[in-house]
């Protein structure tokens, strides 16, 4: 009889511990991080004068320009430029390529040389999400 009571207490304690740990694990689930990346070309790659650029976005939706929604936006490719400060509009010029239709890849043509390419994510009004939503790589165009 003593063995049975002790066994029940052990089983009850173990069950409570497992339940508590399970609940804590569920509460500790991380929120998906928001980030951007340049999936192609690879950092340090040597490419031809016309090459593919693929954008990666995590934790936000890609949507066309003009659509103002929380946690959404579209890609911009900055050529030899620093990330655009949070809240500032991404300029419209040859060094700031806009992909306002929601494109996630494109072909670009650059003359031979060394380039810094930065993916910059911005909202539907072209207002930058800042450096945390940018990624920069170096490429050599031959």
Identify the role of each PLM range.
Residues 2-4, 30, 80:
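Poly-acidic low-complexity segments
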Residues 44, 50-58, 63-142:
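Long, low-complexity serine/threonine/glycine- and acidic-rich segments characteristic of extracellular
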Residues 24-26:
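C-terminal motif of bacterial Sec signal peptides marking the signal peptidase cleavage site
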Residues 2-17:
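Bacterial N-terminal signal peptides that target proteins for export
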Residues 29-48:
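Short, compositionally biased P/S/T/A/G/V-rich stretches that sit at domain boundaries
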């Amino acid at each position: 009889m003593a063995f049975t009571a002790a066994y029940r207490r052990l089983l009850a304690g173990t069950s409570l511990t497992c339940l508590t740990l399970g609940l804590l694990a569920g509460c500790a689930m991380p929120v998906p991080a928001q980030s951007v990346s340049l999936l192609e070309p690879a950092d340090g790659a040597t490419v031809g004068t016309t090459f593919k650029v693929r954008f990666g976005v995590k934790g936000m939706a890609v949507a066309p320009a003009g659509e103002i929604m929380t946690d959404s936006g579209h890609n911009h490719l900055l050529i030899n430029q620093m990330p655009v400060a949070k809240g500032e509009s991404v300029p419209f010029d040859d060094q700031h390529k806009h992909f306002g239709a929601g494109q996630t890849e494109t072909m670009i043509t650059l003359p031979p040389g060394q380039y810094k390419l930065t993916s910059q994510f911005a909202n539907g009004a072209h207002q930058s999400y800042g450096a945390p939503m940018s990624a920069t790589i170096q490429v050599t165009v031959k």
